[in-house]
């Protein structure tokens, strides 16, 4: 029997954490049986970086404005996103609009003004995804209901709910809209009882795997606050960890 082939559906391989050994990370990724990585952009400034990296590594990419970057985003950036999606519309490595969405966790993003701006950019990017007939990769952090409302108002051709950690009812609502749910390193923690139970309640066809590298390290890479205070760095996640996470 052939070994399984994996796809890391969400990893930020353009991040500075990989600047010193990006080629080695890529080699380990392929050696581990991860045949493809999807590299989402987070702001206009890294659109070209993720595109070039995806081509250099024979991976895939997505273009979008992450909710954490909406405070400094402008309508001109939306025009640049629209132009980039049009310019690369025949590029088979461009697979989605993302990472977009809503973040209900970061306090400074949840003032009335900041939340309204998040909503504006989320809805505008859904319209771009609709226009360009692309799926979306959505950031879901304490925001599932708001994301679902946007998707019902502006239907798109499916996508992935990245790092999903909502309820079974919310999961089923995303699935009904043509979405897959992304699971990764968070599942590896013994305390993640609710998330593990949710994963067992979903059909396998609704689940995709991801690392969110360099973030969301699995338990074997995690260092505690005490360890970090003592000088140990936080473990860096990378796509080669995906088979063990699975």
What are these regions (language model features)?
Residues 1-246:
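Mid-domain alpha/beta scaffold segments of enzyme catalytic cores
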